[in-house]
Amino acid sequence: MACEIMPLRSSQEDERPLSPFYLSAHVSQVSNVSTTGELLERTIRSAVEEHLFDVSNAGDQSSEDSEPGPSSASSIPTRQRGHQFKKQDDVWHGCDKELINKENIPSGFSGCAECILNSQEAERFQDDICDYVGERSKPKRQKSSSRLAKLSDNHDGALSMESLSSMQSQETLEPEAAEPLSSESKEIERGGRDTQHCENPTMKIQEHPSLSDTKQQRNQDGEDQQESFVPDMPQLDLTALCDEKTWEEPIPSWQPENADSDEARLSPQAGRLIHQFLDEDSDPMLSPRFYAYGQSRQYLDDTEVPPSPPNSHSFMRRRSSSLGSYDDEQEDLTPVQLTRRIQTLKKKIRKFEDRFEEERKYRPSHSDKAANPEVLKWTNDLAKFRKQLKESKLKISEEDLTPRTRQRSNTLPKSFGSQLEKEDEKKQELLDKAIRPSVEATLEGILRKLQEKRVESSRPEDIKDMTKDQIANEKVALQKALLYYESIHGRPVTKTERQIMKPLYDRYRLVKQILSRASTVPIIGSPSSKRRSPSLQPIIEGETASFFKEIKEQEEGSEDDSSTKPDFAVTLKTDCSAHCFLDQLEDDADGFISPMDDKMPSKCSQDSGLSNLHSASIPELLEYLQEMREEKKMIRKKLHDFEDNFFRQNGRNVQKEDRTPMAEEYNEYKHIKAKLRLLEVLISKRDSDSKSM
């Protein structure tokens, strides 16, 4: 029956190309093999039953001559029958394996008689096929056509008619032996399918090493199981398949540049784009999410792998420790910034204390604050910032102790100017300190020059003895001397410098005040000087007030060369001339004419009018009081209008420096108020005198 099936299979073999890449195609033929086995079993079973029926009708002699197998089989014990069945199963297993693998043999067996092997050669051929399957899992690239052709040549002379006799002896088995035979053949077919499925096609160029290791393990396990049932046979020697006798390890068609590592490599077709980057000397970087999906490091040194995080690449340069950290690069905080941070931390800690007190009804202690990590951080930062603020203030105070040549502009930043300019300034300061004279020597030179100028211009040393022009010249000379001193030593900062230069600065200040405040200097002997005093003379009831007694005494003491005159009008004329002289001195010295200066002669006349009030009667005083009140109301209305307009325009109240446009009105208003107070005092005095009389 096997000879009838083989022509069909040979026709299929002619249509299929013989290539090692089609080794996996024989799996589809397993179903045909199984149907062939079932057909063989049915045929054998029917033949055995028919033969037994014929034997039962024939005689004992004819049955012994024609069929010795069944009679001997009935007489042998059961254990021997089991061994016989096992050998027969091995023969059938070899036949099935031969039928399955026959399509890979191009021109081995042509006839029907060549399809049947004896049991020993079938077992040997089965072991060779298993070894061949194991060798297929290794990455050796050999041509299977030449190898199978050589294998078929070695087995051409091993065929004999003994296999035919064994096949005929199997046909005489009992029906009871046919059932275990069918079950054993099914198990063998399942084993053949497993071996077929264990064999992977070689269409892949390269596999992972772990997969190849597992496949080799499975193949080795399968060989061990087969060797447990099949007796040990010599393995297939593949050296005879090839003319060359020197065998070496397989060489892959593509080798990476760093072939030292034994890690698995990807296909060369996968990294063409990365090759372009590598040609431009740009190292591929690893992705930041590379290490989140495992601890595998087999692709770290492979430049063909897509980008990965740079922290594990062998060609990635580490950050130098000399560059410093981010904290070192932070600039020092200014005192203002430190104060703001301290205030912010205080607010946070205060909020925590209030919330803690609301929840637990008591103030948090230091341990309560330390238990909270956030508050503990705030406390530590607060202490650190306070320490930095204290150190910065101490540093600034130490820097301020050293005298500076000039005040630095606040509009310019601290880093204004290049480093070379700063170095030049420092060098210049050192040279100036070496050449600069002492403060005492500079002061002596200044005083000597001032004395020489006084002698040249014939000015007295005492300011009281100077005239208008002499005071102005003294002011200019002192101003030039002080500017010369400040150009050398700067403004006096230390206590010793201030004590040394104090007399010269005081003299300049006094001269300047005399020139700038000549209009406000009280005139000796003038009734208005007494009126401008902070407080009036106390008026005692029952006594006559003497308003001009002290004034006449001052006149007598100041005028040594001139004789005193009892007439008060002469004194007023002298006072008015002196006042006008001081006004002229102020105009010549400062060059500024105040609108109040034109009204000063009228003040002299007003003072002369006020002097007559003491001899006036009560009706005259009352009339004059009424006039002063009306005049006060008019001036006050003008001043109120001016202040309201100024507030609407500028949005603020009038300050002292804003009163310049209305300076005359303000001054007149002040004098009118003083007159009103004097008139009220005189009227009250006259009333008291009249009542007493």
From Swiss-Prot:
Compositional bias of kind Polar residues: 69-78, 408-418
Quaternary context: Interacts with ANXA2.
Gene designation: Fam13a
Coiled-coil regions, chain positions: none
UniProt tissue specificity: Expressed in the mammary gland, with similar levels at all stages of development, including pregnancy, lactation and involution.
Role according to the record: (Microbial infection) Plays a role in the clearance of Pseudomonas aeruginosa by macrophages. In complex with ANXA2, promotes activation of Rho GTPases following P.aeruginosa infection.
Region (Disordered): 56-89, 136-233, 302-331, 396-424
Induction: Up-regulated in alveolar macrophages following Pseudomonas aeruginosa infection.
Protein name: Protein FAM13A
Modified residues (Phosphothreonine): 402
